[in-house]
Amino acid sequence: MSFDRPASNPPDDAEGLPIGWDAAGYDWSAPQSHRPDPGTLSLGVTHTRYSIDDWGSAPALASAKAVLTATASYQNQHILGWGAENPQPSPGRFDWSSLDRRMKMIRSTRGTPVITLCCAPDWMKGGRPGETNWKRLEVAPRPEHYADFAALAAAVARRYPDVRHFQVWNEMKGFWNAAGNRWDYESYTRLYNLVYDALKAVDSTIAVGGPYVVIDIWANAKNASHPSALAGTCGVVDQRGLDALDYWLRHKHGADFVAVDAGLSTRDQGTITATTTSGELFGALTRWLRQRTSLPIWWSEFHVGRADAAGQQKLTARAVAALLHMADQGAAAALIWEPQGDTGQPHAPALWTSTNGDGGGRPLAYGEAVARLQQVLAGRAGPDAVSWPASELGLAWGREGVLLVHNAGDRIDLQIQGRPLNLGPYEVRYLPLRAGTPVEFAVPGPSAPTAPAGQCLRLTDATASSAETR
């Protein structure tokens, strides 16, 4: 197999080295920050309980901040939970101290801040004023307190005027209709509309998004309690998440982006084992969403599961492949969940190691891959920067380099300008190639083409038609 993309000879100082050998590696001493780019996928993170907190050693914090600067255009923080204490413990009394610390850290690393308006103080959901019961964190506010929560959202917007993007709630937590065995999208949308109106009253240019609903996947339609018509080689989408999305699209007062969430697991068989399929799923869902709405698509909670140390390389390749599929299909943003590493086992791929201790805050393989992807997308070579010459091989082209992800468990042998390049199982590699001269990649032997997004999830006229009415 051969194909052409804009590239050039390696830099002079790389002559004689195996093709693809990046002599310098990523320069973490001078990390380049990236502003969100409306023309391509903007990568970001969602900070969770532990994320570059003050009690880490100074060298570890500095190292982690360098990784964060290079990898995250957007940095998202919840207002209560996931690293933030209760901002309004009782009516009329505010405590911004923990949220202030997180916002200060985001500013210090040149991130574009995002706030997720979740969760609600206890007194809004039946608890005693002044108390915070963390076991009830994910309980939704009571309807009689929806206006109070909207007022809290407005107070947050006034305190942090540099925050231009707000997500309303998280995964519709607490909004469940048990009698109907479905999401309580009516109640969520009522809350969303009150929050939307309150934020726009503070500043009409603030960007507000929802519904931050989980899109569940089944491996087999026979096992699905609520199968949808949106199905294909990647599985069957659960109808209940689609119903919630469609109701919100039809009844929202307004929105500036659509927030969604999905993972690499199925409801019936656990983790999706076909690595090429798992990446294609995010591209197919992005394509379907873009046919439902003209709003930008945000993957508000991106994570790919957990593994022990031996499985981290595979998960990293799966994550990068999914990000390439999102970019290829026109997603606007992807927020990586929990960017700081967990010392326990198994754990999710992280961008840097824990900052709790000497030698912490070091960049991990996932962090370097995301930093390189940021670099490539920022300097992308033309409108079609992402290509899939084979189902297991993805490329993202920039003006000065290309990022390759090999998403399979065997070795793959390539050729660039007649010189060999070997990628190992689940390898992600950056090649410092300048744009300008066509380069032929030769993939010896047969390789199945990547499945088009329409086969991964077949789009019928009914599933692809726009759901938005205003």
Task: State each model region's role.
Residues 49-52, 80-83, 119-123, 170-175, ...:
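Solvent-exposed loop/turn segments at secondary-structure junctions
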